[in-house]
């Protein structure tokens, strides 16, 4: 009987020591997998822009999941879509930061990628405007020379974050 109590006491102590480490491991895994998914979708957008010789957007998705929404909170998810218009006037060919119909030829799926909403344990903050990849693979408005940064963190904050940066050249990195 005493041996059983000693074994139970030792097991309880080991569980108390292991639980915080396991929680940290799970949080790091959650951040890593989400930031890797975002990195993959950004790379898809860049490669599609080059392949199609057209502009592609990565932006916060609206509730319908078919167009961009405003705001810096990317937790509702994101989407990758084709952008070729500036206004409600079809055919003018100037980018407006909205998803447009894909021209005939090739895949007509738009949005191309639809990132799902994040769990309530994660926060993703990014630019309020869409991240735009140009036909040459560069990012942003030509000549602007600014990087786009997205920061993924735990909610509530633990100080552990992952940052995905898209340089003006189009290079995508994760820290």
Per-range role (PLM):
Residues 1-12:
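Glycine-centered recognition micro-motifs in short, flexible terminal segments and loops
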Residues 13, 17-47, 55-175:
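N-terminal helix-rich module
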């Amino acid at each position: 009987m005493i041996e059983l109590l000693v074994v139970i006491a030792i097991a309880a102590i080991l569980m108390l020591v292991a639980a915080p480490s396991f929680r940290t491991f799970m949080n790091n895994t959650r951040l890593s997998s989400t930031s890797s998914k975002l990195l993959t979708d950004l790379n898809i957008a860049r490669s599609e822009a080059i392949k199609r010789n057209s502009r592609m957007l990565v932006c916060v998705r609206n509730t319908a999941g078919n167009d961009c929404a405003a705001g810096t909170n990317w937790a509702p998810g994101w989407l990758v879509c084709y952008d070729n218009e500036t206004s409600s006037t079809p055919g003018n060919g100037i980018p407006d930061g909205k998803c447009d119909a894909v021209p005939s030829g090739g895949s007509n799926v738009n949005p191309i990628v639809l990132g799902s909403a994040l769990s309530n344990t994660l926060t993703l903050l990014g630019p309020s405007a869409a991240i735009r990849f140009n036909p040459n693979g560069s990012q942003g408005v030509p000549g602007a020379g600014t990087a786009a940064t997205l920061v993924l963190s735990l909610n509530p904050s633990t100080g552990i974050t992952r940052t995905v940066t898209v340089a003006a050249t189009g290079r995508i990195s994760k820290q």
